[in-house]
């Protein structure tokens, strides 16, 4: 280990939850030395070697956790669908809403009509509550443009969010999200556009960190998704997949075949799906917000993920249709109460395993030497409180790349 004699800042006075190995890995009364945006030393304050710090920050108790990571969102979109929420509760079916121009197509229409500036302002409004909860990294998907111009517009807005706010933004091209209205009855023709036009151009402009698709009866077949994944491979982009949310199509197995970094939703994943994911190193991203809003009854196979040691990540799935959720903390509680995950598993789901689901585990997700100095200081005494409390208990401070975030 390289000896550290100087650092830019030294932080101590709180217990540190490092989340190394997916466990709390508590350091009582810990200390963190930071140079630039990296952690250069971490451990018990009593074992701190002689280090000259240009600045010292003393916490008065509390807990430090890694910065939270929301690894699956659809934050950039136009319009509002709260009226549909009310309609459904008044007995109008989803099919009736869609037949009258509602549903995802209404979001596509509004997104296409909105300017980049309008989309940016709306997304900023949605992102700020997540920042307030201690989110330091977020993934944002396209998927409401469904043509080259609008998909690129969405991804540009997502990239811009990361430039305007102190947060790391990872972008995902989800052009294969739904069938646009101009291609009704022609899904293979639309997949041609996705593979031959949208993905290559997104790659050329460096607007996406990954490619995603929705494998479901109401979206795209495994064969169509495979074409999307082949196009992503050709463009040099890793893949992810919305899989097994509403039915068992073996999408998770297809994702594993392409060594997807994650397969998401997974309520209907089978044991063979889980085995394939385990062998491929594919992370299971669980989305309790959508499960809750859709009043689903089949939970993801949590025990199988445990048995086969598939990492379980959690995310808000923030979107206008099935998960209008702007709280990652709420997802911790829902994962525990609805999916019977433990508070430790849930916290791993929004830190180390979420980092793995985005392919950034080498730099984020745990607190250890060499990783980014992203953490949250909480006025709490036990990490289980993060999943226990509903509302309140916001962070005392958030540190992003070595600096206190305003």
UniProtKB/Swiss-Prot annotation:
Zn(2+) binds at residues 72, 74, 242, 317. It is found in: Cytoplasm. Its cofactor is Zn(2+); Fe(3+). InterPro entries: Amidohydro-rel, HutI, Metal-dep_hydrolase_composite, Metal_Hydrolase. It comes from the Bacteria. GO terms for cellular component: cytoplasm. It catalyses: 4-imidazolone-5-propanoate + H2O = N-formimidoyl-L-glutamate. Its EC number is 3.5.2.7. It comes from Yersinia pseudotuberculosis serotype O:3 (strain YPIII). NCBIfam families: hutI. GO terms for molecular function: imidazolonepropionase activity; iron ion binding; zinc ion binding. It holds the Pfam family Amidohydro_1. The lineage of its organism: Bacteria, Pseudomonadati, Pseudomonadota, Gammaproteobacteria, Enterobacterales. This is Imidazolonepropionase. Pathway: Amino-acid degradation; L-histidine degradation into L-glutamate; N-formimidoyl-L-glutamate from L-histidine: step 3/3.
């Amino acid at each position: 280990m390289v000896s550290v004699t100087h650092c830019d800042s030294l932080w101590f006075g709180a217990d540190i939850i490092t989340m190394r190995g997916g466990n709390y890995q508590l350091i009582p009364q810990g200390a963190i030395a930071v140079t630039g945006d990296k952690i250069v030393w971490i451990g018990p304050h009593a074992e701190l070697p002689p280090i000259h710090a240009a600045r010292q920050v003393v916490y008065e108790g509390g807990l430090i956790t890694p910065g939270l990571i929301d690894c699956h969102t659809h934050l950039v979109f136009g319009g509002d669908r709260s009226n549909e929420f009310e309609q459904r509760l008044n007995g109008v079916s989803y099919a009736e809403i869609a037949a009258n121009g509602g549903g995802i197509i209404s979001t596509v229409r509004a997104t296409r009509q909105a300017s980049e500036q309008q989309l940016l302002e709306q997304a900023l409004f949605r992102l700020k509550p997540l920042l307030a909860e201690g989110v330091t990294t977020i993934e944002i998907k396209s998927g409401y443009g469904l043509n080259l111009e609008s998909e690129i517009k969405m991804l540009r807005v997502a990239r811009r969010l990361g430039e305007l706010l102190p947060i790391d933004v990872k972008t995902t091209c989800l052009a294969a999200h739904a069938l646009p209205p101009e291609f009704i009855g022609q899904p293979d023709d639309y997949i041609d556009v996705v593979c031959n036009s949208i993905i290559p151009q997104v790659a050329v402009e460096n607007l996406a960190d990954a490619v995603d698709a929705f494998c479901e009866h109401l979206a795209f077949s495994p064969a169509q998704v495979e074409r999307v994944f082949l196009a992503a491979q050709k463009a040099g982009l890793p893949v992810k997949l919305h899989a097994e949310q509403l039915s068992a199509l073996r999408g998770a197995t297809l994702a594993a075949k392409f060594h997807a970094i994650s397969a998401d939703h997974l309520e209907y994943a089978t044991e063979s799906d889980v085995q394939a994911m385990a062998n491929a190193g594919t992370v299971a991203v669980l989305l309790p917000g959508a499960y809750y809003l859709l009043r689903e009854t089949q939970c993801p196979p949590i025990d199988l993920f445990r048995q086969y040691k598939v990492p379980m990540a959690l995310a808000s799935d923030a979107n206008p249709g099935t998960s209008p959720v702007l709280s990652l903390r709420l997802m911790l509680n829902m994962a525990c109460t609805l999916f019977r995950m433990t508070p430790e598993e849930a916290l791993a789901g929004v830190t180390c395993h979420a980092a793995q689901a985005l392919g950034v585990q080498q730099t984020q997700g745990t607190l250890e030497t060499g990783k980014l100095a992203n953490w949250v200081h909480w006025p709490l005494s036990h990490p289980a409180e993060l999943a226990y409390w509903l509302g309140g208990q916001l962070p005392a401070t958030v540190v992003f790349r070595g600096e206190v975030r305003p």
